[in-house]
Amino acid sequence: MTAAVSALTEPGAADGASSPMQRMDRALRLYRRRISRCRTQNQLNRVNIAVENYVTPAEVRYFHTALAGEPAESPAYQWITRLARGMPNNIVRPVEFERRGLCKGVTHYSANPSSAAQKTLIIGFTGIAHRLMMPTPWVLDCLNPALYDVVLLRDFARVAYASGIPGLGGDFHTALSKLSTHVDRGAYRDAISFGTSAGGVPAILAAILLSLDKAIAISPQEFGRVAALLGRHGLSDTAYASLLASRPQPFPEVLIVCAAEHGDDMAAAASLQRRVPARVLKVRGCAGHVVLGWQHAHGMLPPFLAKILGQSLERQAPASTALAASWVVGSSGGPSPQPTVARTQDHPEPDPSHAS
């Protein structure tokens, strides 16, 4: 996050002394103040991108309405119009996500009146851009806040979370253990770690460390690349390697998602699958690293998220979303809403530690 929007995204943004409308109005005023100080397009872009990394769907709608009177050529109008048009569902719900900064690198999104026992907790490990491959409200817009809480983690040191998270701890194990003092994983129906790109391997590690139900790693780096990154910063990869090699029971379900036409990501997925029991889901027709962005561009983000999460995004009862098929784009170039069962690209592999 840039310093320019620190006040907008500071911990404790959802304080109990003000209403959601008052907090959104305060955020809007802070946004206007920040962009008024920008003198270059790069400065504007930095502010807008940083805000996109934090705001909720309700805040996007509020900003969109408030900025509708701006001149069409104004940067603020163009930015919020693009952001609002990109919302996958754009549904006004009975309860809405509110955000609360737990510390510098941790933001909690929750509809507070809802019971955690009815919800799935998603712990998101963002990549180096501090987002899950796209603006945060686009991801949140796919989820029913009555059924999901989301905790987004950000690695400002850009060392695969190995130096911890400010305010939680100075290493991965300490930071993740301290997270439980803010968010009670055991209070939820189930808990899933969800990491993209540089956050992929940490998501797998977190699921093992915290005994989560599932880990989803989208376009993760292969472990050798993570180890090399740590080495360049004088950090040891021993704790990460040991955790990947451990087999606590019950062991979390691990799903690795990658673009079928991206050679490096395919190789990284295969390499990780040799280290940890996992399934690999290859997204056909996708040649880019940013798999979630590709699904969004094809209008398939909500059903794709339901598929990889293995449950409905809208209903309490789990949906039937067995990963026995690839997610494809038809030969016409348009998205196919149904998987092609006869052409599976889901590859389970036995635990490598049990191989003969």
Predicted regions, residues:
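Glycine-rich nucleophile elbow surrounding the catalytic serine of serine-hydrolase chemistry
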Residues: 195-207
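Alpha/beta-hydrolase active-site loop
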Residues: 166-185
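The feature captures the conserved acid-bearing segment of alpha/beta-hydrolase catalytic domains
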Residues: 228-295, 307-320
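Alpha/beta-hydrolase fold nucleophile elbow
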Residues: 185-197
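Short, surface-exposed "cap/lid" segments of acyl-processing enzymes
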Residues: 91-148, 155-159
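Cap/lid segment of the alpha/beta-hydrolase catalytic domain
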Residues: 151-171
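Active-site nucleophile loop of the alpha/beta-hydrolase fold
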Residues: 217-227
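Flexible, membrane-associating and regulatory peripheral segments of lipid-active enzymes
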Residues: 1-121
